[in-house]
Every structure is written in C-alpha cells, then in structure tokens.
C-alpha cells in the first residue's frame, strides 16, 4: 500500500517525483524549486489562501532534491519530534516546480502527512491486553490518536514463561512491532521507529528486546511499575533465612 503519511521519528522517508517519459524533448528538466504549504482547498496553484511553511525543521523535517532530464524528485525525512500535541496527524503540501531547457516550467503538488509514532503497549504477568483497552479507547476518543496508531499486544498465552523465551522464542515484542507497522501502513502511514509502553513484565520484555534483539526501531520506552532490578521480595529472603536458622538452632529456653 502506498503511504502518504510518515511517523515523526527523524528517520522515516517518503519521495515525491514529477516525471516525463524518457525521450520527451519538450520537457527536458534542468532544475527544480521546492516549497511547502499548509492548505485546505481544491486548487493550491490558483488559490491564494495558502500558508507558506517557513519552519521546515520542525514541521516538514528535512529534504533532499535530485533531478534527471525527465524527473524531479524530492525525498522527505520526517521531523524528529511530533509538532502538534492535540492531533493524531497533520498534513502539508510539497510543491515541486520543474524548469525546462526550453524556458518553460511545470509544477506538481502532493499532500504529505506527519503522524505520531505508533505505540505498542504490553501488559504484565498473569494479565492480558484487555487491561489497556480502556486506555486505548480514551486516547482514540480524545482525537490525539487513531486506532491503528496503538497496539495493545496480548501475550497471555506465554507470559508465565521466562523472559528469554518471550524475547527470543515467542518474539513477543518483535512480532508486536511487525503487527503495529502493518496496521500503520494499512492506513497509509510509513514508519521506522515506535514508542513502547510496558507494565511490569511487559516493560522488562521491551527493555530486553532493545538490549538483545534490536534497538534501531525504538523511539522511546516508558515502563510502569517494572522491576528492572528484581522484585523487592528478593531482598527480604536473606533476612528471612537468617531468622529461620536462628530460631531453628535456638535453645528451647528462648522459644
């Protein structure tokens, strides 16, 4: 599926090309100009009610241009951070104006969207994805996300297995990210990096995925009540064993 939006992660790219058939001597391209606009209308070329975007870095991201005698291409790289905090995505127009060898010119405009990074949410031990369904529904109802931008991944069938098994054998996070990227692409969003939220064991699995499998596709990680340094009950055990041994060896007079 062709994407027209990209997630704000500083890496995802889309290309727009104005092209003519090879051998078309009337339209030999010598150079091009690129501009960006906010516009909500039917004809950007004749309508003066458009806003030129000057803050390229934060709204558009970055871009490079390339042209041959029959093509003019702009490659866009998404901004590193999401510019709008209240919408699921925003859009702008990129306008390519190609100049021809014969002195003429032609322009094309393409709508491009910038989306929030997709979010994968992992539940904890002895739990299921149903725990975070109300949270997902709240975020979607707020208008800040669309449903495809959030995946509440369920791994209840394996979450009593070891961290290693869930990371490497069952590939909980890896498969979840694949599902999330497909969900995004199905609604026209190209993506490279993703936000991860994990509760308890879910946070550990996301951290282990980054440490042991792949850390090139993570935008940010947020963990909730995750025992990264082990469960606190582990600190109680040595003292508990000491008391048990002490009382077991104590003289009956002290019991």
Q: Predicted regions: what is each one?
A:
Residues 1-114:
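Beta-strand-enriched, solvent-exposed domains that form extended recognition/catalytic surfaces
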Residues 197-202, 206, 225:
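Gly/Ala-rich beta-loop-alpha elbow adjacent to hydrolase catalytic centers
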Residues 149-152, 206, 229:
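Short, well-structured secondary-structure segments
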Residues 187-190, 201-205, 213-214:
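Extracytoplasmic/secreted proteins and extracellular or luminal domains
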Residues 14-16, 120, 204:
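Hydrophobic beta-strand residues of extracellular immunoglobulin-like
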Residues 115-194, 239:
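Active-site catalytic motif of lipid deacylating hydrolases and related acyltransferases
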Residues 174, 178, 191, 210-255:
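Helical cap/lid subdomain of alpha/beta-hydrolase-fold lipid enzymes
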Residues 133, 206-211:
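Short, hydrophobic alpha-helix immediately C-terminal to the catalytic nucleophile
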């Amino acid at each position: 599926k062709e994407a027209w939006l990209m997630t704000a992660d500083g890496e995802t790219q889309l290309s727009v090309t104005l092209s003519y058939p090879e051998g078309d001597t009337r339209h030999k391209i010598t150079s091009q100009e690129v501009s960006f606009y906010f516009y909500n209308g039917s004809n950007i070329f004749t309508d003066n009610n458009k806003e030129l975007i000057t803050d390229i870095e934060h709204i558009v991201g970055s871009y490079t241009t390339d042209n041959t005698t029959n093509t003019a291409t702009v490659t866009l790289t998404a901004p590193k951070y999401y510019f709008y905090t209240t919408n699921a995505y925003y859009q702008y127009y990129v306008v390519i104006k190609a100049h021809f060898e014969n002195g003429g010119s032609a322009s094309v405009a393409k709508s491009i969207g910038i989306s929030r990074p997709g979010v994968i949410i992992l539940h904890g031990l002895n739990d299921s994805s149903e725990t975070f369904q109300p949270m997902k529904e709240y975020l979607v109802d707020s208008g800040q996300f669309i449903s495809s931008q959030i995946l509440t991944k369920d791994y209840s069938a394996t979450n009593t297995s070891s961290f290693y098994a869930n990371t490497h054998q069952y590939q909980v996070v890896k498969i979840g990210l694949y599902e999330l990227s497909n969900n995004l692409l199905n609604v026209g969003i190209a993506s490279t990096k993703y936000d991860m939220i994990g509760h308890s064991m879910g946070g550990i699995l996301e951290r282990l995925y980054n440490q042991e499998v792949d850390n090139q596709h993570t935008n940010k990680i947020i963990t909730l009540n995750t025992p990264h340094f082990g469960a606190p009950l582990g600190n109680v055990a040595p003292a508990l064993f000491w008391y048990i041994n002490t009382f077991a060896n104590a003289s009956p007079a002290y019991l």
